Amino acid sequence: PEKPEGYDARAAQTLLESFPDEDIPEGEKIAVMGVMLEAFCDLTDFDALAGFDTVQEVYAPWHALEEQSLSGRLLTNIFAGGTVDTEWGFLTGASEHDEYRGATGSYVRYFTAQGYAAHYAHPGYSWFYDRERVNDYLGFERSVFTENGFGELVDPYVAMWHSDQQLADYLLADLDAADGSPLFSFAVSYQNHGPYAETESTVPYVSPEASGWSQESCNMLNNYLFGVNETVREYVRLTQELDARDTPVVLVLFGDHKPWMGNGGSVYEEMGIDFDTSTLAGFRNYYATP
């Protein structure tokens, strides 16, 4: 990338050094909880879907949550897959990564050095992306996957479409078990993982008659929105449950990438979404998540 206009490396280093590197005071070691949401994006960002009241209703609780929070858009470097690029970027601050082969600097290790417990949760298999091993390298003290916990809570196949309730409940129980001790927890959801069926759908959020799009495209959108509708409500519930507790918590929710929508992004193409990444608008459309 080109050097930004007005950038001065020496001035940047001086500015960086002006921020003190201090430990978190004992009385301020509040819980920090991060949740990366599988294939989560706000489809009302696209004009093609923003005009549907049924779609707006899906995201209305999320929009209300955004109004109460610090919110915006995360620009990832992946589309419809490659989840761990966003995951490990969040945990390390590095925009790119090589294969992890040993102990690696991370925010996880920062928190454990400050006396926090560091827990990881994902209702999927530990071998996928070699997460179990990498989590050890990143500094997590405990990682719970399908094999050692979530398999008793939700069938791993069903988890692709319905597991946010179980994950939210697990995170709350883990927080309660900490009983006020400093805790950094990070979870990767599995619900809404693609692909989304194109042959049928349960709830008709959009239809060929109202949209002019093919039945197959509408089915994929409807099946995705059906899962997202539940996701939104589960994590709004999570925030409400946290608000009801005496223990303060910093909660960070974000999506890992845009959802897969047909081979070659066929659904996006049919909706007329601009994915020209040579333009700022197209780049944001392609990579931005809440």
At which residue positions do the language-model features occur?
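Solvent-exposed soluble domains appended to multi-pass membrane proteins
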Residues: 8-30, 34-290
